[in-house]
From Swiss-Prot:
PANTHER family: GERANYLGERANYL PYROPHOSPHATE SYNTHASE, THIJ_PFPI FAMILY PROTEIN (AFU_ORTHOLOGUE AFUA_3G01210)-RELATED. Its cofactor is Mg(2+). A motif (NSE/DTE) lies at residues 231-239. This is Bifunctional terpene synthase FUP1. Hexamer. It comes from Fusarium proliferatum (strain ET1). Residues 330-745 are annotated as: Prenyltransferase. It holds the Pfam family polyprenyl_synt. It catalyses: isopentenyl diphosphate + (2E,6E)-farnesyl diphosphate = (2E,6E,10E)-geranylgeranyl diphosphate + diphosphate. Mg(2+) 2 binds at residue 96. Dimethylallyl diphosphate binds at residues 509, 587-588, 625, 632, 640, 650. Keywords: Isoprene biosynthesis, Lyase, Magnesium, Metal-binding, Multifunctional enzyme, Repeat, Transferase. Fusaproliferin shows cytotoxicity against pancreatic cancer cell lines and provides a new chemical scaffold that can be further developed to obtain more potent synthetic agents against pancreatic cancer. Fusaproliferin and its analogs show also anti-inflammatory activity and can be hit compounds for the treatment of inflammation-associated diseases.
C-alpha cells in the first residue's frame, strides 16, 4: 500500500501541545480555512437577520485561534464543500446552545418544530413567523447547496439531520448510565455522531456500501469514543459553570459519570477521562492496523475514509483545547465562577455559595443541596434545596409517536349506551314508549373517521405541505389561514387516495393494505365523501368567498381528470400524449393549483405586475405525476408494490409513449391489460411476475423509459427557469422551493433498462 496523499497542512505536535492538547494522533488543517470562516460569518449574519433573537451574540461558534472547527475536523474536504459543512456545524452549535437554556418541555417543543420543518412526512402546518419556519429557511438554502454539490450524499446528510439528530435526540433521556459503555451508546445516538459521519462522507465525496460500513465499524466506534470524550474533557468547566449560574439547564459530561459511579474527585475524574481518550486513540490505531494486516489489498477509498476519521478525532481534540467555546471561561472573573483560588460560586436555589472544587466528590456536591444526576445520554436532573427537579438532556426532546385510540371520552357514552341497551330488559316491555322518548343527538364519528385516520397515518412524500411553505415565501398568507389551507389540502388529498384505490381496485397503498381492504368499500367511500364535506366546511368557515370558489372549481377539475383516467382503463382506450397531459393537469395538477389559488385568495402580499404562478404550478404537476409514473417501475416499487401501475392497468406516460410510437407492442400490452379485473367487486389480483417482466421488457426495448426520463429532465429545466423568473420579479430568493424540487430531481434517478 502506497502512502496517502494529502491536500491539507500538518500541525506539529509541539505546536498543538501549547494549547493543552494531548492527542496522540496526527493533526491536519484544511488549506482553505478562510472558506470555513467566511461560511461561519455568513451563518451568524443570516441567523441575526432571519431569527432576530440575539442568540448569535451569546453563542461561541466555530472560530478559534488555531482554525475553524470544520477546517480541523474536515481537513481533507473538497474545497467547494467546506463552506456548507461549516454553516451546518454552526447551526448545530447554536441549536444545542438554545436547547441547553430551555426546560425539557420547551426543548421538546423546539425539537419537534424543527423536526417538522425538515420532515417531508410531517403534515402539520408551520407558523410563517415561528422559529421552526425561520430555521427551515436557513437550512433549506444550505441543504440545496449540498444537494447541488452531491445529490446522493447531500440527501443522505439531510436525512441524518432530520431522522437522527432531531428525531432521536431524546432517546432514553430518562435513563441514568451506570457504565461508560451505556453512556457512550446513548451519547453516540443522541449527541450528533450519527449525523457527523454522513457529513464526513459528504466532505470527501465518498460513498460506502453496507458491507464497507460494517467492515470499518469497530474502527469508527473507537473514533466516536475519542470525539465524544474530548468534548467532555474540555467542556466540563464551562458546562458546570453554566448550570450552576443558571445560564444552562443541562450538562453533558463523562466527568460527572466517573465522579458519580467511581467515587472520584472531579480532578481525578477528569484524569480518568483523559486516560480513556488516549486509550480510544490507541484502540483506533490498533484496529486500523489489524484490518490492514488482515486485508492487505483493502481499497484506497476505505484507507482514506479511515485516515480521515482519525484526522477528525485529532482535529476536534485540538479545536476543543483552544476554541473560545470551551475556554472563554478562563478569562471570567469571580462573578462567573472561579475566583482564582480554586473556589467556585454555586447557586443552590436559595443563593450563591463559594465552595472549593478541588477534590470535590459527587457526594460532596449532593451535600451542598445540588445534585447532578447523569441520565445516561449527557442529560441531567438538577435538584435544588427546595426539592425542585428539572430533567434535562444533551440535545433536545424525544419524538412522540402518534397513537390512535379506539374511543375518545366523547365517544364513551355511545359505547356505554350500547351496553345498557343490550342488558336493559325494560326495553323488551316498552318498545314503543322507549323509542319515542330517545333524545336526538349527533352520533359518534368513530366509524366515519377510522378510514381517514388510517390513510393519513401512512408515509407521505409531503410535497404539498412543502409547496405551501415555499409559496408562502412570496404570498405572505397569515398563519391562521395557512393552518386551514394545510388541513383542507390534507383532507382532500387523503380522500382522493381512498377513492383512487377503490376505483383502481388496488389492494395496496405505499406497501400497506388500502383503506377499503381494512374497512370495506362502502365505509371507505362514506369516509372519503365526508372528508370532502369537512374540507369545504373548513374553507367556508375560516377563509374568504374567493377561496371557497377556488376549492369548488378545482374540485370539479379533479373529478374531470379522474373521469378520463378511469374511462381509458375500463375501455382499454389509450390516450394521446396531449390527452394524457391534460388529464394530469386536472387530476394531479388540480390539487397543486387549488392550494395556489386558495393561498392567493388569502395573500397579504403587495401585487407585483407580471407575477403569475400558473406556469410554475402547471409544470410542477406534470413533473410530479410523470416522475411518479417513471418511479413506479424503479426503486419506488419498494413502497407501492412491484410495478403496481401494471396491476391497475394504468395508461401511464411510458405506456402512452410505447403504444403511440411502437404499434408492434400494442397487442402485448393491451392483451395483458384485458385480462385484469376492471371492477371493484372482483377480487384484485396482481399480474404474474412473468407478465410484468414481459411488459417491462417491451417498454425497455421501445425506449419508453429513456423517453420518459428525457421528458422529466426537460420539464425540470423549465421549472428551474420559472423559479429564476419568479425570484427576479419578487426580488426574493426561495430556497425552500428549490429544495423541494431538488428532492425530486432527476439528477438522483437511475436510468431504467
Amino acid at each position: 500500500m502506497g502512502p496517502l496523499l494529502y491536500r491539507s497542512r500538518h500541525i506539529p505536535a509541539e505546536e498543538a501541545q501549547e494549547t493543552g492538547c494531548f492527542t496522540t494522533l496526527p493533526i491536519r488543517i484544511h488549506l482553505r480555512d478562510d472558506l470555513a470562516d467566511a461560511a461561519s460569518r455568513r451563518f451568524v449574519s443570516d441567523w441575526a437577520r432571519e431569527m432576530g433573537d440575539g442568540r448569535e451574540k451569546k453563542t461561541y461558534f466555530s472560530f478559534s485561534p488555531v482554525g475553524n472547527w470544520s477546517s480541523l475536523i474536515y481537513p481533507e474536504a473538497i474545497p467547494e464543500r467546506l463552506g456548507v459543512l461549516a454553516y451546518l456545524s454552526d447551526l448545530g452549535l447554536i441549536h444545542d446552545d438554545t436547547g441547553e437554556g430551555l426546560s425539557i418541555e420547551e426543548a421538546q417543543a423546539e425539537h419537534d418544530e424543527l423536526h417538522a420543518a425538515l420532515d417531508p412526512d410531517d403534515k402539520s402546518s408551520l407558523d410563517p413567523d415561528s422559529r421552526a419556519m425561520k430555521t427551515k429557511k436557513l437550512v433549506s438554502q444550505c441543504m440545496l447547496e449540498c444537494i447541488n454539490l452531491d445529490h446522493e450524499l447531500g440527501l443522505n446528510m439531510l436525512a441524518a439531520f432530520r431522522d437522527v439528530w432531531l428525531a432521536i435526540s431524546e432517546k432514553n433521556s430518562d435513563k441514568e448510565a451506570q457504565t461508560l459503555e451505556e453512556y457512550l451508546q446513548y451519547r453516540s445516538d443522541n449527541g450528533g455522531m450519527l449525523v457527523f459521519w454522513p457529513m464526513l462522507q459528504f466532505s470527501l465525496g465518498i460513498s460506502l456500501s453496507e458491507a464497507e460500513h460494517e467492515l470499518v465499524q469497530p474502527i469508527i466506534d473507537a473514533a466516536t469514543e475519542g470525539l465524544l470524550l474530548a468534548n467532555d474533557y474540555f467542556s466540563w468547566e464551562r458546562e458546570l459553570r453554566e448550570v450552576q449560574s443558571g445560564q444552562s439547564k443541562r450538562i453533558v459530561s463523562a466527568v460527572e459519570l466517573f465522579a458519580r459511579t467511581m467515587g472520584l474527585s472531579v480532578e481525578d475524574a477528569k484524569e480518568a477521562v483523559k486516560s480513556r481518550i488516549i486509550k480510544s486513540e490507541s484502540d483506533f490505531c490498533q484496529r486500523r492496523d489489524d484490518l490492514y494486516k488482515a486485508q492487505p489489498n483493502i481499497s484506497s477509498k476505505l484507507r482514506r475514509w479511515i485516515d480521515c476519521a482519525g484526522l477528525a478525532v485529532s482535529g476536534n481534540h485540538y479545536w476543543c483545547s483552544a476554541c473560545p467555546r470551551q475556554n472563554a471561561w478562563k478569562n471570567d472573573t469571580l462573578s462567573n465562577g472561579q475566583n482564582g483560588h480554586g473556589l467556585y460560586r454555586i447557586h443552590d436555589g436559595n443563593g450563591f455559595k463559594t465552595v472549593p472544587m478541588t477534590n470535590k466528590t459527587a457526594t460532596d456536591l449532593q451535600s451542598n443541596d445540588i445534585k447532578i444526576l447523569s441520565n445516561g445520554n449527557g442529560g441531567n436532573a438538577i435538584l435544588n434545596g427546595n426539592g425542585a427537579k428539572t430533567v434535562v438532556n444533551g440535545n433536545g426532546a424525544k419524538r412522540k409517536l402518534s397513537q390512535y385510540r379506539m374511543a375518545s371520552p366523547e365517544q364513551e357514552p355511545f359505547v356505554q349506551k350500547k351496553r345498557s341497551m343490550d342488558t336493559d330488559t325494560s326495553c323488551q316491555k316498552h318498545d314503543i314508549q322507549t323509542v319515542s322518548q330517545y333524545p336526538h343527538h349527533k352520533p359518534s364519528n368513530l366509524a366515519m373517521d377510522a378510514p381517514a385516520a388510517y390513510i393519513s397515518g401512512m408515509p407521505s412524500k409531503g410535497v404539498r405541505a412543502a409547496l405551501i411553505d415555499a409559496l408562502n415565501t412570496w404570498l405572505h398568507v397569515p398563519s391562521a389561514a395557512i393552518k386551514t389551507i394545510t388541513s383542507v389540502v390534507n383532507l382532500l388529498h387523503n380522500a382522493s387516495l381512498i377513492l383512487d384505490d377503490l376505483e383502481d381496485n388496488s389492494p395496496l397503498r405505499r406497501g400497506l393494505p388500502s383503506a377499503h381492504v381494512i374497512f370495506g368499500q362502502a365505509q371507505s367511500i362514506n369516509s372519503a365523501n365526508f372528508m370532502f364535506v369537512r374540507a369545504v366546511q373548513e374553507v367556508a368557515q375560516s377563509l374568504s368567498p374567493a377561496a371557497l370558489t377556488a376549492v369548488l372549481e378545482e374540485l370539479e377539475g379533479l373529478y374531470l381528470g379522474q373521469s378520463w383516467d378511469l374511462y381509458w382503463k375500463f375501455n382499454l382506450a389509450c390516450p394521446t400524449e396531449a390527452e394524457y397531459v391534460n388529464m394530469i393537469d386536472h387530476k394531479t395538477g388540480g390539487m397543486f393549483r387549488m392550494l395556489l389559488r386558495v393561498m392567493q385568495a388569502e395573500s397579504t402580499a403587495t401585487e407585483t405586475p407580471g407575477l403569475d404562478f400558473e406556469r410554475l404550478i402547471l409544470l410542477f404537476g406534470r413533473f410530479f405525476q410523470i416522475r411518479d409514473d417513471y418511479m413506479n417501475f424503479g426503486d419506488y416499487a419498494a413502497q407501492k408494490g412491484l410495478c403496481e401501475d401494471l396491476d391497475e392497468g394504468k395508461f401511464s406516460y411510458p405506456i402512452v409513449y410505447c403504444l403511440a410510437n411502437h404499434p408492434e407492442y400494442r397487442g402485448h400490452i393491451l392483451g395483458v391489460f384485458r385480462q385484469r379485473p376492471t371492477v371493484a367487486t372482483t377480487t384484485a389480483s396482481p399480474l404474474s411476475t412473468e407478465s410484468k417482466a414481459h411488459l417491462v421488457s417491451c417498454l425497455r426495448k421501445c425506449g419508453a423509459f429513456e423517453k420518459t426520463l428525457s421528458c422529466l429532465r426537460d420539464v425540470e429545466r423549465e421549472l428551474e427557469l420559472e423559479i429564476d423568473r419568479l425570484e427576479r420579479l419578487t426580488g426574493e430568493a426561495n430556497p425552500m422551493l428549490r429544495l423541494c424540487l431538488a428532492k425530486l430531481s432527476t439528477k438522483g434517478i437511475a436510468t431504467l433498462g
